[in-house]
């Protein structure tokens, strides 16, 4: 049974095929209407990911069952594993899950084998965010038509960002030149496998893509939150007008959103010409349609 849990566990050729498929759907290629049933199970609040999956499911003809964990038997102590077995027993084909726990799926897969729906990871703690990573790849490829050789910098709260972790690895494997910048206390040691840590303004004029990350106040310590200065962070690691103008004409800026305006990106620049933030959201629907097709091994017209 196929699942979509970690984009870096998928063959690179399949990842590239998913990018092409998402763009083909966006261009109007036909999709097969499904008679499958999907459950969206979100243990963390979400606007973009949740609604984007719902839109993707609607466009593919899925029957939807949304479950609020707080109003389910999990609030009585039922395990996620038993909940998924229950959903499979009543006919659910796919479960889209966002969870607070890193790698929540490992225990589920060990305990259940094939007695569960197809699983799609909609974000796990500070671990992985594979569907966001795919839509970012779609957005980058749509702009440049390749990944190899692009100079890409990820800026901000690297330590607590599942987006950063997914993107750093997959973009490195696709041949991009990766650099990272952010507060020293938020620089994970293992990112050195994928690129270099640099000062934010180093070689700025040669960057093709800059991905800014949200400061994840819900994941940092109380002391860090108390000592956090919005003004200081924006000056040191934010996108201001000077940095924006120094980017080359063809460069793009991205952000997984929600954006803390005037923190990661100046308010006036969130929708500036080089910004692709809302285009990322648009591409998210097509990327998640491609993910649903891939996970259920649905057939479709060639791209």
Curated annotation (Swiss-Prot):
Residues that hold carbamoyl phosphate according to the record: 48-49, 98, 129, 132, 257-258
Reaction it catalyzes: carbamoyl phosphate + L-aspartate = N-carbamoyl-L-aspartate + phosphate + H(+)
UniProtKB keywords: Pyrimidine biosynthesis, Transferase
GO molecular function annotation: amino acid binding; aspartate carbamoyltransferase activity
Oxidoreductase found in the keyword field: no
Pfam family, one: OTCace_N
GO biological process: 'de novo' pyrimidine nucleobase biosynthetic process; 'de novo' UMP biosynthetic process; amino acid metabolic process
GO CC annotation, single: cytosol
InterPro entries: Asp/Orn_carbamoyltranf_P-bd (IPR006132), Asp/Orn_carbamoylTrfase (IPR006130), Asp/Orn_carbamoylTrfase_sf (IPR036901), Asp_carbamoyltransf (IPR002082), Asp_carbamoyltransf_Asp/Orn-bd (IPR006131)
Chain positions recorded as L-aspartate binding sites: 76, 162, 214
Pathway: Pyrimidine metabolism; UMP biosynthesis via de novo pathway; (S)-dihydroorotate from bicarbonate: step 2/3
E.C. numbers: 2.1.3.2
Role this protein plays: Catalyzes the condensation of carbamoyl phosphate and aspartate to form carbamoyl aspartate and inorganic phosphate, the committed step in the de novo pyrimidine nucleotide biosynthesis pathway.
Family to which this protein belongs: Belongs to the aspartate/ornithine carbamoyltransferase superfamily. ATCase family.
Complexes and interactors: Heterododecamer (2C3:3R2) of six catalytic PyrB chains organized as two trimers (C3), and six regulatory PyrI chains organized as three dimers (R2).
Entry-linked PANTHER family: ASPARTATE CARBAMOYLTRANSFERASE, ORNITHINE CARBAMOYLTRANSFERASE, MITOCHONDRIAL
Record-given protein name: Aspartate carbamoyltransferase catalytic subunit
Organism, scientific name: Leuconostoc citreum (strain KM20)
């Amino acid at each position: 049974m196929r699942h979509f849990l970690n984009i870096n566990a998928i063959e690179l050729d399949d990842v590239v095929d998913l990018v092409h498929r998402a763009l083909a759907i966006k261009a109007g290629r036909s999709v097969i209407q499904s008679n499958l049933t999907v459950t969206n199970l979100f243990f963390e609040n979400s606007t973009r990911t949740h609604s984007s999956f719902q839109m993707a499911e609607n466009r593919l003809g899925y029957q939807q069952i949304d479950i609020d964990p707080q109003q389910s038997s999990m609030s009585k102590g039922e395990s996620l594993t038993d909940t998924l077995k229950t959903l499979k027993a009543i006919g659910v084909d796919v479960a889209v899950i966002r969870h607070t726990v890193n790698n929540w799926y490992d225990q589920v897969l060990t305990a259940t084998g094939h007695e569960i729906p197809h699983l799609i990871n909609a974000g796990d703690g500070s671990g992985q965010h594979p569907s966001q990573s795919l839509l970012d790849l779609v957005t980058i490829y749509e702009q440049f038509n390749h990944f190899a050789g692009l100079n890409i910098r990820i800026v901000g709260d690297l330590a607590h960002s599942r987006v950063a972790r997914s993107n750093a690895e997959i973009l490195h494997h696709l041949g991009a030149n990766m650099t990272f910048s952010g507060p020293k206390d938020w620089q994970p040691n293992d990112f050195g496998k994928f690129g270099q840590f640099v000062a934010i303004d180093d070689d700025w004029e040669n960057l093709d893509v800059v991905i800014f990350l949200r400061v994840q106040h819900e994941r940092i310590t109380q002391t860090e939150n108390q000592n956090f200065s919005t003004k200081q962070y924006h000056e040191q690691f934010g996108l201001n007008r000077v940095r924006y103008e120094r980017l080359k004409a063809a460069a793009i800026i991205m952000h997984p959103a929600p954006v803390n305006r005037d923190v990661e990106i100046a308010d006036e620049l969130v929708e500036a010409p080089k910004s692709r933030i809302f285009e990322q959201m648009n591409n998210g629907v097509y990327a998640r349609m491609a993910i649903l097709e891939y996970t259920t091994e649905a057939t479709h017209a060639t791209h």
